[in-house]
């Protein structure tokens, strides 16, 4: 393998990346389920959320504030829109990075209608002053707006209409306890099972007017990393291949051939993932090897290897992070069809000078 091939495999460009690009955002709007009955997967979350929303409607009150955590692409934004739809309320969408000052948040909160849903994505990235203002807004439906500066500054209380905050985060551990405690309902979104992704793919194919058989859907689902967003993206690329190279019908063979062109293998690994594994196995005998050394060997930044490639490899049981460095598992050797050397025993070797 040419190690230079992986140098442009950034998180935003990866076909199997979970972050949404502009095409994803446009297509997801058309594919997004409108209510809880249409939403596929996350059975426990759906059941619990349904109870919360039904009870709120029965009381004629706004819903409790909701915190949704989990990896990108699992449906947090979709659920926020479903919450608004189920409550018959409008929704306002913003994100933590967009709220850097308390005044930014005050402007949004003061313009909310009664019962409106405020969706705050990446809530863990909100600034501390805005975060502290949110405490009072969530609990008492009021904020204190500071007018003036220095000794002459005064706090003017501003009453807010009752609203529902839906916060979404990929890093729930970064939320301070006072903020987490103010959410009446908290749910963690799990990765999807293959059979759930098959249902997602069949539904999306119907909406996109794409003909696909059950084995074709299963082939795509198996490479989708447990993430509906990735499943829908792979479906679109396989659709393109089927239209150009075949009769437009997606079968298992067509799906496999298409994803081979796009370099997504049977377990959902792409060029960057395989580059990391091949370097670890072929150059370092399976490890342990330090992260910095491994990144140099792959031709990527340390952060790219650690934050983009490694999480999925660890989740798949192909790579282990140890105090002495990165170590390939027996499953990694098997996946690449390689035979481990006699001393590749899962981390008993000597680490390198760069550390883990």
Curated annotation (Swiss-Prot):
GO molecular function terms attached to this record: ATP binding; ATP hydrolysis activity; four-way junction DNA binding; four-way junction helicase activity
EC number(s) on file? 3.6.4.-
The record's subunit annotation is: Homohexamer. Forms an RuvA(8)-RuvB(12)-Holliday junction (HJ) complex. HJ DNA is sandwiched between 2 RuvA tetramers; dsDNA enters through RuvA and exits via RuvB. An RuvB hexamer assembles on each DNA strand where it exits the tetramer. Each RuvB hexamer is contacted by two RuvA subunits (via domain III) on 2 adjacent RuvB subunits; this complex drives branch migration. In the full resolvosome a probable DNA-RuvA(4)-RuvB(12)-RuvC(2) complex forms which resolves the HJ.
What are the disulphide bonds in this sequence? none
Residue positions binding DNA: 302, 321, 326
**Residues engaged in binding ATP:** 31-32, 73, 76-78, 139-141, 182, 192, 229
What name is this protein filed under? Holliday junction branch migration complex subunit RuvB
């Amino acid at each position: 393998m040419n190690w230079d091939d992986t140098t442009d495999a950034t998180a935003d460009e990866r076909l199997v990346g979970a972050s949404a690009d502009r095409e994803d955002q446009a297509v997801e709007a058309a594919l997004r389920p409108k209510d809880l009955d249409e939403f596929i997967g996350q059975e426990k979350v759906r059941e619990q959320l349904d109870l919360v929303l039904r009870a709120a409607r029965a009381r004629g009150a706004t819903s409790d504030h909701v915190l949704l955590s989990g990896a990108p692409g699992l449906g947090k934004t979709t659920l926020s829109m479903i919450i608004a739809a189920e409550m018959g309320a409008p929704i306002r969408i913003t994100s933590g990075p967009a709220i850097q000052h308390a005044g930014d948040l005050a402007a949004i909160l003061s313009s909310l209608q009664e019962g409106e849903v405020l969706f705050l994505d990446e809530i863990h990235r909100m600034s501390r002053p805005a975060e502290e203002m949110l405490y009072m807004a969530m609990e008492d439906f009021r904020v204190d707006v500071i007018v003036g500066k220095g000794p002459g500054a005064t706090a003017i209380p501003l009453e807010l209409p009752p609203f529902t905050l839906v916060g979404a985060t990929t890093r729930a551990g970064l939320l301070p306890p006072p903020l987490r405690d103010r959410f009446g309902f908290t749910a963690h979104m799990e990765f999807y099972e293959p059979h759930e992704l098959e249902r997602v793919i069949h539904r999306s194919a119907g909406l996109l007017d794409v003909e696909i058989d059950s084995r074709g859907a299963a082939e795509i689902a198996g490479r989708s990393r447990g993430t509906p967003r990735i499943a829908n993206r792979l479906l679109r690329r396989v659709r393109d291949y089927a239209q150009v190279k075949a009769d437009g019908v997606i079968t298992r063979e067509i799906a496999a051939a298409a994803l081979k062109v796009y370099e997504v293998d049977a377990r959902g690994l792409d060029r960057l993932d395989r580059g990391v594994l091949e370097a670890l196995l072929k150059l370092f005998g399976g490890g342990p090897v330090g992260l910095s050394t491994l990144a140099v060997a792959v031709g990527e930044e340390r952060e790219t290897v650690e934050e983009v490639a490694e999480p999925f490899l660890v989740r798949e049981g192909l790579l282990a992070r140890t105090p002495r460095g990165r170590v390939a598992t027996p499953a990694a050797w098997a996946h690449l069809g390689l035979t481990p050397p006699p001393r590749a025993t899962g981390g008993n070797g000597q680490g390198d000078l760069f550390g883990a």
